[in-house]
């Protein structure tokens, strides 16, 4: 119990990383009460993240920030997809640390385990059973045509395993095991969601109605794409690591990365359009800086008096103020293995109750209830 009191604030953000610890007794009391899946009438949302690296600013603004809001309005199932990681990272030596790190960073970013079901994929064996069933409804030709499979074959020709080919089938099992209504996905995963809809349709047609067809969660204008610091696309784990700001980066590394952000020689015509690399910096600033700060530098750019060194210094300090509280909270949570074990235990209990109910219905529809 004492170790729980050392963990910092798990939801919301405060620039005071030494903020008073929350009442973890109350948190776990709420978690205990919600072990039974509530019949709330709320729509179910399911999403997962692979434990293949630290979370970055793009993960936060592109997903986590919205997840924090969603947990107040939906029954949310947020999964650490450790089985999925094996398709590209078969060495499991660091898997435990990676899973714990992702859990800690999710909680530090605001996911409340007393409100959302936070669990690990491999702790829910019913997913594997549904995966097997759905594989009988998937076809080699359609799986080989998926853009992500073709891209992985190009990137890792020495390891084209069956897990890569059937990756969309496992994703479908992740979603359908909870009979989720909404799935927050990026454009790169839209094809996989459509396949999940197809598998649901095929099951319903062959064995009887069971699954609703999952839909992409529409964030509308709230969906944010965070640009990389080198001006080449969005922040990503797989691209230029020095152009990506991680939630685990220390203050000096944040400053170093931001100061190396790509710029041009500066504007020479008043009120000219910003080139992409400069627009990227302003977009990043709009995420973490005050409105007054953004307006000040925007005006400087418009009248050709902007100094990029000052712009990047300001952005660096604002990034430090934003990231450092999350990093410090995540570090404390990560090292409190007792707390994380309790979170996973509670999340697994909720997720398994939902999964078992679905699998029982699957077996009934398919006629596996022989006696």
Annotate each predicted stretch with a short phrase.
Residues 23-30:
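Short, positively charged and aromatic/hydrophobic N-terminal segments
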Residues 154-203, 207, 227:
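Internal, conserved structured core segments that host functional sites
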Residues 140-144, 177-184, 289-297, 327:
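Short helix-capping/linker segments at secondary-structure and domain boundaries
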Residues 106, 134, 188, 232, ...:
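Divalent metal-coordination and catalytic microenvironments
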Residues 191, 197-371:
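Conserved nucleotide- and phosphate/pyrophosphate-binding catalytic cores
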